[in-house]
Amino acid sequence: MINAVTLVTADMAASSTFYEALGFERVVGGPDTPFTTYRVGDGFLNVQLDPAHAPVPAIWGRVIFWVVDVDAMYERALVHGYVPEMEPTDAPWGERYFHLHDPDGHELSFAKLLS
C-alpha cells in the first residue's frame, strides 16, 4: 500500500493555497516552509519546495484521489477559481472523475467508484 506521494513545487505559497482551497488537511509545513504534508484519507501528500523545478513534462502520469463527492470537489475547485480539464464524467471503467492541474502542472484526478 502506498502511504504517501511527494510532488515538487517551485512555489510553496501557491501550492499551499491550491491544496488548502480544495480541502486538503495540512499536517505540517505551510506556505513559508520548504516541505508541507497534507492528510489525504489514510495517506499523505507531501509537497517539497524546489525553486529551480522545471515544468512537469507533458507525459508523467497523474495522482488519483478518491473522494466522497466528485461533483462537490469539482464545484469547490471552480469556486476558488481553478479550471478543471473537464466536467465530472462517468467512465466506462466504473468511476466518476475529473482532472485538474496544480500550480506546478501536476495532473490530479478526483474520482469515486460508481457502484
Report each predicted region and the residues it spans.
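Short glycine-enriched loop/turn motifs at secondary-structure junctions
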Residues: 1, 55-60, 91-92
